[in-house]
């Protein structure tokens, strides 16, 4: 398996572990269609890795909805979106360093419209971050950027 920027594989003879924190923006500026598209992107990542994708799925607006761990598509499917306030990206990175120190994700994928101030890159603590944006207007100052069409 080729190792990419976001998907570091931890591999033994019979096991590959890919650990990603997916955070979906559920702020008031995100429509139901946008949230559904973001959720579908996460499901697509799980499907792409044939069940070998382990991770957490969380939601955020101005607060973190605690990420839920999943190790299978069935576990992923029972996680439901919550939120609806403003948007704060910094709380994601603070959450990771406060609550996930025992098992840091190999990467963080933030699915958002990007309409909020961006935190300083140093807060990521060296963890690769992908901003998965649903528009062409916003350009984060750091991390990798990908776009989805809604």
For each predicted feature, which ranges?
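Acidic, polar low-complexity linker/tail segments
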Residues: 1-21, 30-33
